[in-house]
């Protein structure tokens, strides 16, 4: 049983997942700070305040604090937009780098490939001249 657990716990996928969770948690703190400390105050200046937490419906002694729910949805949308923009920029940068790497990886054609290309071009010329006649 111990050996099975070791195989499971130290398998590459499990360790990769653990690293991803730790990095994701740290990145989540960065994004939350970006939203809370930078984006929300900027939106608050533009929109004249963005705090819904005090909104509530009161029925006698009971209150439904729906404002906190709306604020949580609003925060989620801002966080989702910030992550979307980050991922979009990241994907654009990585795709440019991958394209450059692909260009560098293309080998020079061998002499045989060059000759085969010339033969192909000659055959195309012959076929097109036959079609005209």
UniProtKB/Swiss-Prot annotation:
Bilayer-crossing residues are 14-34, 67-87
One GO CC term of this entry? plasma membrane
Give the InterPro entries listed for this entry: Mechanosensitive_channel_CS, MS_channel, MSC/AndL, MscL_channel
Provide the primary localization. Answer: membrane
Question: One MF term from GO for this chain?
Answer: mechanosensitive monoatomic ion channel activity
Q: Where in the cell is it found?
A: Cell membrane
Q: Its membrane topology, per UniProt? A: Multi-pass membrane protein
Q: Which family does it belong to?
A: Belongs to the MscL family.
Subunit structure and binding partners: Homopentamer.
Q: What is this protein called?
A: Large-conductance mechanosensitive channel
Q: Which gene encodes it?
A: mscL
